[in-house]
């Protein structure tokens, strides 16, 4: 009789947490910048605060698309690192710079001409003017943000996640005084309001980019990589094709996920501000808690890729299931706390008792949502480690847009199945679609892991 070696899973779980914790803290620091921008701009006027929110609905989907293209690098680099082919890592990083050069211009143009979207949506003139100014300022930091991500992916790929954490916290520390100067007009500089947030963010992005590059150039653990010996090399279309085959599905999946929640808010807006507010409370809470499994998923990508590079398919499997076990244990805790303190959580955001009651109901659904969300993001992270990103895209598109959105809309806005449920209908759709996604991603992961090692590694060698 064959027994499971739980000690091996325990070892991999510890390594996962060591990689995931800095990723989590970096995410908290990054999200805190957005919170600081919202709070500080809100002290100027409600229009300035609204401009940050409206601008973010344009900025994040597009920038996350560019970010997603570069997420092909961590599994590629971790595989090379694990297989002892560190001399090939620099080439991948340099080709990542070409991905930035090819993507930055179209993304920048789309952001610059976002006024066309605002005209179509008939956004109020004053709000539109502030939002466009904010986005135009942010564009100057776009190349820096993507360059920083490129070199962060290098560090993540070799399982060095602490530098990004430290640099992001330094960026947060700089963001606050720069906001103070540019939003309110200090040190002889005019008051720019929300546009000042965009200026500050662009400067912070360049600051973090320079720090990240300086670290990579001087870190002892990267000297043998010789990334900067010839930082600019000709585009290698074979390498670029392989990276984009991995990164493009991730980019589209990220874009579609962000777009799903943005569209949900728009579809709820005719139902009144109270319903939109309750939805936003549940979404903000879920987004904050989502950072926990997301960090585990990113750590799983790195460690699965490294184990596969070492030729240890059994250890890659142990990493996948260790991440799932840890993630579900965390989900039990966070879901329980969400249920117990749902009213108190809602009271952090608003004082209106009707909104608190509606948000409390949505948070009950959100507690259930956390289990499916954990499984799908961790399984997706493991699949990225196996370089199987197209399956993630197909499953995401099917579950979110063929199942989740139609079901959510039907339950929320129509009487076809039952009286319209409002925001609850969309959240039920989220739970159902995420549960299906989690199931399909687990099936896909198990199918890949069931392959004979020779076939698995032959496929991975073609993708490196």
UniProtKB/Swiss-Prot annotation:
Keyword ATP-binding: no
Transmembrane segments annotated in the record for this chain: 16-36, 51-71, 97-117, 129-149, 164-184, 194-214, 248-268, 285-305, 321-341, 355-375, 391-411, 423-443
Entry GO MF terms: antiporter activity; xenobiotic transmembrane transporter activity
Record's keyword annotation contains Ion transport: yes
Major location (coarse): membrane
Membrane topology summary: Multi-pass membrane protein
Annotated localization: Cell inner membrane
BP GO annotations: monoatomic ion transport
GO CC field: plasma membrane
Top-level taxon of origin: Bacteria
This protein's UniProt keywords: Antiport, Cell inner membrane, Cell membrane, Ion transport, Membrane, Transmembrane, Transmembrane helix, Transport
Role, per record: Multidrug efflux pump.
PANTHER family reported for this sequence: FMN_FAD EXPORTER YEEO-RELATED (PTHR43298:SF2), MULTIDRUG RESISTANCE PROTEIN NORM-RELATED (PTHR43298)
Family per similarity comment: Belongs to the multi antimicrobial extrusion (MATE) (TC 2.A.66.1) family.
Name of the protein in its database record: Probable multidrug resistance protein NorM
Organism, as annotated: Pasteurella multocida (strain Pm70)
Organism classification: Bacteria, Pseudomonadati, Pseudomonadota, Gammaproteobacteria, Pasteurellales
Gene name tied to this protein: norM
């Amino acid at each position: 009789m064959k027994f499971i070696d739980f000690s091996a899973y325990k070892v991999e779980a510890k390594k996962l947490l060591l990689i995931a914790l800095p990723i989590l803290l970096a995410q908290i620091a990054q999200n805190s910048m957005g919170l600081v921008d919202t709070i500080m701009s809100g002290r100027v006027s409600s229009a300035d605060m609204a401009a940050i929110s409206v601008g973010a609905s344009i900025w994040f989907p597009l920038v996350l698309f560019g970010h997603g293209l570069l997420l092909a690098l961590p599994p590629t680099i971790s595989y090379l690192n694990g297989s002892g082919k560190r001399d090939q890592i620099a080439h991948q990083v340099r080709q990542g710079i070409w991905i930035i050069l090819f993507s930055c211009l179209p993304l920048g143009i789309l952001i610059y001409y976002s006024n066309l979207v605002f005209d179509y949506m008939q956004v109020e003139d004053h709000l539109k003017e502030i939002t466009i100014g904010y986005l135009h300022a942010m564009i100057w930091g776009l190349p820096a943000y993507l360059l920083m991500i490129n070199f962060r992916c290098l560090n993540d790929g070799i399982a060095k996640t602490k530098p990004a954490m430290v640099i992001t916290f330094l960026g947060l520390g700089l963001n606050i005084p720069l906001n103070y100067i540019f939003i309110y007009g200090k040190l002889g500089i005019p008051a720019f309001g929300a546009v000042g947030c965009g200026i500050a963010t662009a400067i912070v992005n360049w600051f973090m980019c320079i720090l990240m590059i300086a670290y990579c150039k001087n870190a002892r653990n990267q000297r043998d990589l010789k990334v900067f010996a010839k930082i600019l090399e000709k585009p290698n279309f074979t390498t670029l094709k392989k990276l984009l085959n991995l990164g493009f599905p991730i980019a589209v999946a990220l874009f579609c996920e962000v777009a799903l929640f943005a569209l949900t808010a728009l579809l709820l807006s005719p139902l009144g501000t109270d319903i939109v507010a309750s939805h936003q409370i549940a979404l903000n809470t879920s987004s904050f808690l989502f950072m926990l499994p997301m960090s585990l998923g990113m750590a799983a990508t790195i460690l699965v890729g490294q184990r596969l590079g070492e030729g240890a398919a059994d250890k890659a499997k142990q990493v996948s299931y260790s991440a799932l076990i840890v993630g579900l244990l965390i989900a039990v805790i966070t879901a329980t706390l969400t249920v117990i303190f749902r009213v108190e959580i809602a009271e952090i955001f608003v004082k209106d008792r009707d909104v608190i009651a509606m948000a409390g109901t949505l948070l009950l659904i959100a507690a259930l949502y956390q289990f499916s969300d954990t499984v799908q993001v961790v399984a997706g992270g493991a699949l990225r480690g196996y370089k199987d990103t197209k399956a993630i895209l197909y499953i995401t598109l099917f579950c979110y847009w063929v199942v989740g959105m139609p079901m959510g809309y039907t339950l929320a806005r129509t009487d076809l199945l039952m009286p319209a449920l409002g925001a609850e209908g969309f959240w039920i759709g989220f739970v159902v679609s995420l549960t299906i996604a989690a199931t399909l991603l687990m099936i896909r992961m198990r199918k890949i892991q069931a392959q004979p090692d020779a076939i698995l590694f032959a496929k991975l060698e073609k993708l490196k």
